[in-house]
UniProtKB/Swiss-Prot annotation:
Tissue: Expressed in ripening fruits.
Pfam families according to UniProt: KWL1
Lineage, opening ranks: Eukaryota, Viridiplantae, Streptophyta, Embryophyta, Tracheophyta
GO cellular component: extracellular region
Species of provenance: Vitis vinifera
Signal peptide: 1-27
Subcellular localization(s) per the UniProt record: Secreted
Protein name per the record: Ripening-related protein grip22
Domain of life of the organism encoding this protein: Eukaryota
Length: 220
């Protein structure tokens, strides 16, 4: 009798363990649940910083925005192509590319004189003309200028004070060349520059004497 009872008890335990397995797996793969290794999840979730979350490489959205752990941003693929140093100056990186353009692209706004004899050097690359600084116009870093494909197009620039302005692309802020007469002796531009006229700075309510400020921009 005792032996039969033990057999019955063992059978019950076995059935309970089998029935518990799906719930255990579900618990391990729950969004936001704790985990320690990549094996602590099932399906298309991944262990990120000790939490089960969507796998950014797979592109799943099972967890949605419930997890406190954001997906990591894609790595930047824009790397320097070389260096160039003006006489007596330090070497600067040169670029053929710029960061990806988004609906709110981070950039550095600088000030440029588009008039003849100004610090912009030669005439604007888009139309081979000089422009009055009262125009709301900009030059874009080489990668964003993209061989002139954005010439004449409008972009929206937004400052950190909340003000924004529409400006027309008329020139390239050369990230590859510099230190010569064509570039007014200036070194190459960084790869994240929006070089704006006085009118752009004034419309944004910014002090031109600051020289450069962080902004965002997008195609209008």
């Amino acid at each position: 009798m005792a032996k039969s009872a033990l057999v019955w008890l063992a059978s019950v335990c076995l059935v309970f363990n089998i029935l518990s397995l799906p719930f255990l797996a579900l618990g391990l793969s729950s969004c936001g649940g704790s985990c320690q290794t990549l094996n602590d999840y099932e399906g298309q979730l991944i262990c990120i910083n000790g939490e089960c979350n969507d796998d950014p490489e797979v592109g799943t959205h099972i967890c949605g925005g419930n997890s406190s752990t954001p997906s990591p941003p894609p790595p930047s693929t824009c790397q320097p192509s070389g260096t160039l140093a003006c006489k007596g100056g330090k070497p600067k990186n040169t670029y053929t590319c710029s960061p990806p353009i988004t609906s709110s692209t981070p950039a550095v706004l600088t000030n440029n004189n588009f008039e003849k004899g100004g610090d912009g050097g030669g005439p604007s690359a888009c139309d081979n003309k000089y422009h009055d600084n009262s125009e709301r116009i900009v030059a874009l870093s080489t990668g964003w200028y993209n061989g002139g494909s954005r010439c004449g197009k409008m972009i929206r620039i937004t400052a950190q004070n909340g003000r924004s302005v529409l400006a027309k692309v008329v020139d390239e802020c050369d990230s590859m060349h510099g230190c010569d007469k064509e570039h007014a002796g200036q070194p190459p531009c960084d790869n994240n520059i929006v070089d704006g006229s006085n009118a752009v700075w004034n419309a944004l309510g910014l002090d031109i004497n600051i020289g450069e400020v962080d902004v965002t921009w997008s195609m209008a």
